[in-house]
Regions:
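Short helix/loop capping segments that flank catalytic or ligand/cofactor-binding pockets
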Residues: 63-64, 141-144, 208-211, 255-257, ...
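Extended, polar beta-sheet/loop recognition surfaces of beta-rich domains
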Residues: 196-199, 204-212
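Post-Walker A helix-loop "phosphate-sensing" segment adjacent to the P-loop in P-loop NTPases
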Residues: 271-282
């Protein structure tokens, strides 16, 4: 495998040449405790950014195996890592300068849902972490600015990887809570089948969103309270006792005046097929 020094030599050789020379950088390189892969190089600085990936060995990341030993936990922890990595990348995006998309560093944007994404994967057997992202290779016009890309690959990215993908530098309690929340949510879904329910809304849920174009919870909204006739109690693996409204199989009529929350409730139920991050309210 080529090393980071090999990549730097390529960049120094093609500096100030025409943009297509960037294609010489395609390949996989060893960067200390992680591997950098340059998978696709954009055709010019105004095109869609180049696609890269980073692989951190499990023995270097050191995320405890019990945090990804089930599908739901692995998905939740990978989601947490991706959000953390995205925050770090935002600090450095466009810090390297040039034309068009030069200097952009970005990864898939995450919404309120916790989903299985190819942008971040954890290999169950090895604990290896793979993150896929995009970088705008810098140029002035269509002339390569290799020095700016060296800043990205040798200064900015190592800092992002160090802070976001190594367990010792993470908020370890937050990672643990993300995994536990995923287990609790999965447990509720399993209980629905056993109890003959099709949906469950926990007491204290915040169902309204802050606007019609945002999925974030509304501030100062009135928390949901279950009617006594539909109240259900569950004991979750981590949170413990949880009460809320259980909707049974059959026909349930939702009635009320204008702006009483009928659509808000239905939209929350619709989104309930997906796990959500802590604090979402649903």
């Amino acid at each position: 495998m080529k090393t980071s020094e090999d990549l730097k030599q390529i960049l120094e050789r093609i500096d100030h040449r025409g943009y297509p020379a960037y294609k010489d950088t395609r390949g996989v390189y060893q960067f200390g405790t992680y591997i950098l892969g340059i998978d696709h190089v954009q055709g010019d600085p105004f095109a869609a950014p180049s696609r890269l990936h980073i692989q951190v060995a499990g023995r270097a990341a050191r995320i405890p195996g019990n945090l990804y030993d089930s599908k739901c936990k692995k998905m939740a922890v990978a989601d947490y890592l991706l959000r953390n990595f995205a925050k770090q990348l935002e600090r450095y995006s466009f810090q390297a300068h040039g034309s068009g998309k030069s200097g952009i560093i970005q990864v898939t944007r995450c919404g309120q849902e916790v989903l299985e994404r190819t942008a971040c994967e954890i290999e169950e057997k090895t604990g290896n972490i793979i993150v896929r992202f995009e970088v705008g290779f810098p140029a002035r016009g269509r002339t390569i600015q290799a020095g700016e890309l060296i800043k990205i690959l040798y200064q900015y990215l190592p800092a992002c990887v160090e802070k976001a993908l190594y367990y010792k530098n993470m908020d370890q309690n937050a990672v643990k809570r993300a995994a536990e929340l995923a287990v609790d949510q999965e447990y509720i879904r399993e209980q629905l089948k056993k109890e003959g329910l099709i949906a469950f809304v926990a007491d204290g849920s915040i169902l309204p969103r802050e606007s019609g174009v945002s999925q974030r919870p509304m501030k100062d909204a009135v928390p949901f309270v279950s009617p006594d006739s539909m109240k259900v109690t569950m004991k979750l693996p981590y949170k413990g006792v949880l009460t809320g409204m259980g909707i049974r199989k059959g026909i349930t009529l939702v009635v009320g005046g204008g702006y009483h929350g009928k659509s808000t409730l239905l939209k929350a139920l619709e989104s309930g097929v997906y796990p959500h991050i802590a604090g979402d309210g649903r």
